[in-house]
Amino acid sequence: MNKSFILSTGSYLPKKKLGNDEIALMVETSDEWIRQRTGITQRYIADEAELTSDLAVNSAKNAIEKAQISVDEIGLIIVATTTPDKTLPSCATIAQNKLKCKNAFSFDVQAACSGFIYAVTIADSLIKSNDRIKYALVIGAEIMSRIVDWKDRSTCVLFGDGAGAVIMKSTAHCNEMTENSTRGIISTNLYSDGNVDVLCTKGGISSTGDSGKIYMNGREVFKHAVDKLTASIEETLRCNNLKITDIDWLVPHQANIRIIEAVVKKLNFLMEKVINTVDQHANTSAASIPLALDYAIQKPKIKPGSLGILVAIGAGLTWGSVLLRY
């Protein structure tokens, strides 16, 4: 049966770093307050001239180079983002133009912080159903600093900018089947519940004429995040007849170290098997998981043949997970 696997990863972070002490000069907070409650020490901020598509393209080039493929071989491009360059066209088609990728079809996915999970799931389904797609480029890219209220200390300390990308390959185009037969996306699950008020923007194009700024009910988000991330992982294990001890690594959405620790405790998982970049990247929304995945593979904390789970939750609420063998 045709399936997909992650061939390569890439990432891009803007040059500017914004530390907690610098934020403390903007709002009433402190490095200690931010660290204790979130685990975040810094975040990256895009230059005024940078667009989300620029971040996406830079991460894509990194992944394409590692995959050692031509852009002409890419048949599908999906960009997961909440902060596109324009209302239309999609960020994916803009990135496609900048990459000079002529043979793909492209579109955006908007599922907030769960966007990359949604995008990988869609790409996997399209690869399985379309033998003509040899390679898919899946990107999570965000400039969250543009929709943050920098006067709201409860949210402005949480977010950062960045992009991560993966090249997914179809096994229908593999000559090296003995090498890649065990690699691949094994299962995915996606959910949403329409609980829109706990995490949203105060405004939008059709309601206020602008993108709006982020609003969050922190306590409610924490409770939902811990319960839903845990349940998604448990469902993945149940559906695949696995135990938590079978999992070699976990890449959770990098929102808050306290959420990650609470999920790990409920699962009775080992914290040393968890990929954690929230301290350096902060919450980069849809870019969070591909950034962390690329970091872990480069270290290498994720090694070929290992079994792992990607899991995220975002506004909507939306959540889900991907089980894969790298």
Swiss-Prot record:
It holds the Pfam family ACP_syn_III_C. Its EC number is 2.3.1.180. Pathway: Lipid metabolism; fatty acid biosynthesis. One of its GO terms (biological process) is fatty acid biosynthetic process. It comes from the Bacteria. The active site is at C113, H253, N283. InterPro entries: ACP_syn_III_C, ACP_syn_III_N, FabH, Thiolase-like. The keyword rRNA-binding does not apply. HAMAP family: FabH. Catalyzes the condensation reaction of fatty acid synthesis by the addition to an acyl acceptor of two carbons from malonyl-ACP. Catalyzes the first condensation reaction which initiates fatty acid synthesis and may therefore play a role in governing the total rate of fatty acid production. Possesses both acetoacetyl-ACP synthase and acetyl transacylase activities. Its substrate specificity determines the biosynthesis of branched-chain and/or straight-chain of fatty acids. Belongs to the thiolase-like superfamily. FabH family. This is Beta-ketoacyl-[acyl-carrier-protein] synthase III. It comes from Wolbachia sp. subsp. Brugia malayi (strain TRS).
